[in-house]
Amino acid sequence: MLKFLSVITLIPTTSLLVISCTSQTKETTKKTENPTQTLSPDKQTINKIKNILDQQSEAFGSFHTFQDVVDQIKVYAKNEGIKELDKLELLDKKLANKTLTLGNNKNNLKLKYFDIEIPFVLKNVLENEVKTKYSSTNPNEIIQLGYKKNDNYIQLNIENKTITKVPVTLPLKINSFYEAFDGLKSKIVTNLDKWDTSNVKILTNAFNNAKNFNTNISNWNTSKVTDMSGVFFDAEKFDQPIGKWNTSKVTDMSAMFFGAKNFNQDLNNWDVKNVKNMAQMFWDATKFNGKITNWDVSNVVSTNNMFADAESFNQDISNWNTSNVISMDGMFARAKSFTWSLRKWNVKKVVKAQGFRIENKNNLDDDKIPPFKNEVKEYIDD
């Protein structure tokens, strides 16, 4: 009987021992699988970042904040294949909104990447401007884009009219291309197609008089652009497929393709519902016959000379909603190929249509012109 009790007593003790050992083993395994470590980048990555900082030491102006600098450096770091850029930040985040101080070596930024502190001293900060830098071996290659403050915009500033190569990266701060490539003589500008233009709002006269320009910029992000007036004014050779550009915020397309003699692309999918001004848009775009049937022009106020001298144009725009157009002066002047009837157009608000069909009466006879008021119709051939 005593022996029996002994066996009974030993059983739970043994079980407890086994459970305890198993629990300790699992705990040990957990500790082995999840060791506490402080991650640090390798020396090569740190050197890459330092090299970027050295290259960009004169690439900022007085309109930049400390955080602007960090954000821009992150873009260059990403291009270099550096990972986990959320770990690259200001050491003192309270300085994020501080603007840069004018002068040489007066801005000492302290960055950190993981637990590594990296000092960054800006060599030269100019007032509202960043200077353009050119390659020492090729005067037509820009290695640092210049830009300046112009009213409420930060404007790309390119003075050399024979450039053939630009940096891959467009600085984040630039939001205006006003006359940026005005008078450019080059046909191809290497890397221009790679720019992230998602911050750009103004394209006014960007390629004005760039007579040879024909670089493919079809992938540009134009989602924030509000003004496209004169973008390709007299850009005689330009003919690239820009039909996928996002034009949903654009309000002004006046003279956009004025004199763009070779341009002939399908623009049917453009969202133009917010455009108010299409005056002179295709004036003297002699080859243009791209489809624009689906355009919502219900907010357009002016179509003056829109297709004047567009001698190839003959697309069906008979169902356009022209109910808000006030002025149609010279709209189809000398547009000798256009033959569609415009009788369904709503022209109740039109008060001017002088020269509407000048030198084009044979194609746009009285049965095809819009139902103008008599006082307007009187001058359509003048």
Predicted feature locations:
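Negatively charged
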Residues: L2-D382
